[in-house]
Design a protein with these regions (language model features):
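Acidic, serine/threonine-rich low-complexity disordered tracts
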Residues: 1-53, 91-174
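Hydrophobic, well-structured mid-protein blocks that either form specific transmembrane helices
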Residues: 43-88
Length: 174
């Protein structure tokens, strides 16, 4: 069993915390639980997901509402999907076709490889493969720069949503 945690904050204004628990069998990532908490000026919301691979169902809890959804295909939370994409790139099996568990539905979430480039972040300079999420909405974009030398660990993530841009860059490798 693996646990993946991400925390980000803008001093005094906003914070985000994501947690995912999953197993890896061969090339397949199987999430079991996930949660995402966003806080803005002290007010926050948490979205929880519980995956049941044996019944092929996922239960979403948000704002006191519980929704159980059928998984006809393996579905992922944000973090377990990132790990599945890494596994697929490592094993030459990247298809770009993935499913995300949302608050009230399971949504097909396509990705595409957008070439290779060398980028510099605080942790160093890396040759990367860029993977873009394909959004229906032109005002949104999400790009990941993954370093093959680090087993496709993301060294940069860039997201634009309604004109607001957020960049995350790798600062240190332990």
């Amino acid at each position: 069993t693996w646990k993946y945690n991400v925390k980000a904050r803008v001093a005094g204004v906003a914070s985000a915390s994501q947690n995912s628990t999953f197993t890896i069998n061969g090339n397949n990532v199987n999430p079991t639980q996930a949660s995402t908490t966003y806080k803005l000026l002290g007010m926050g919301r948490t979205h929880k997901l519980d995956f049941n691979p044996s019944s092929k169902k996922v239960t979403s809890n948000y704002k006191g509402k519980s929704t159980t959804m059928n998984m006809s295909q393996q579905a992922f939370d944000d973090l377990s999907l990132e790990v599945q994409i890494r596994q697929d790139l490592l094993n030459g099996k990247f298809s770009g076709n993935y499913y995300m568990a949302k608050k009230d539905k399971i949504e097909k979430t396509p990705f595409k490889k957008s070439g290779s480039t060398k980028i510099t972040v605080p942790a160093g300079t890396f040759n990367t493969v860029r993977v873009d999420r394909v959004h229906d909405d032109d005002s949104r974009s999400t790009s990941f720069w993954l370093a093959p030398s680090l087993d496709y660990m993301p060294v940069k993530v860039s997201q634009i949503n309604d004109g607001k841009k957020m960049d995350l860059e790798l600062t240190k490798i332990n």
